[in-house]
Amino acid sequence: MVPIKDVTQWIEQAVILYKQGMPYYKIAQQLNIGRKTVSHYLRELGFKSNEKYVRNINVNKLRKFDYSIADNIFENIDTEEKAYWLGFLYADGYIDNSKNVISLSLKESDKSHVEKFRHFCGLDEKKLHTKTKTTNNGTSVNYEFSFSSKKTVEDLFKCGCFNKKTFKISFPSYDIISKELIYHFIRGYIDGDGSITHGGCGSSAITLEVLGTEKFLTTYNKVLGFENKKLYSFNHTSIKRSIISGPYAIYVLDKIYNNAHIFLQRKYDKYLELRRLALASPRTARLLAGKIGKDLANVDTEVTTA
């Protein structure tokens, strides 16, 4: 391929081909240049993709997307959906403050969940993108939905969700999300960065594990009624783990799935199955119905800082 430093040797020809209606990948093939390189330099010159020439698209059905539809979705967190998706983006979203881009990418088996987020944003007709990754374990495909909105990025920032948040985020205050909606936020976060497992070796005990910053998880534990619960290190990094097991995990999961209308289906199905197995134990059933509920029902879960 032509070295990138020799861009002057091919860029004029690329512009000519572009103006003839040729899409990026065809230009790349004809000039023996990487497609991403062609795309980068043409976009730098102000040229957009020749969408009408992309295969399998009906030209008559093409139209510009009205991204303003999504501008106000996180202005106020006042519904279950908003609280849930804010939690999911906290855990597994990508927010580019410099380019005003919001993106969500999940593995192929969770494609329908990416479509749910797209629908929530009011952009059903916007195409999902696929990303293929090859490792020693084989090839995997992710589905990604992204859109650009300066207003949405600003609102997410006000809610504590921003770029490079992995080591910085704090649990949102009740000024951002009300007590009535906080479990929907937690469910979104768990769907994005939590796991529900069983004890193994014949054990029916459920374990709920969530990753996050120490500051975030300290408040997360407090809201759930485990203020003094120990946090564990994760792979020798500053990221921490909150681990809740046994009947207490069932109690928490029951709370976050109560009256829920949106969730990651595979994780919800796993919760139902492991709950069924755990409650086959009379002791677990008694604890859940009695002492645990009483112990956690009236804990002080006030959150004052974001």
Q: Which stretches of residues belong to each language-model region?
A:
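Internal intein/HINT superfamily modules and their associated LAGLIDADG
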Residues: M1-A306
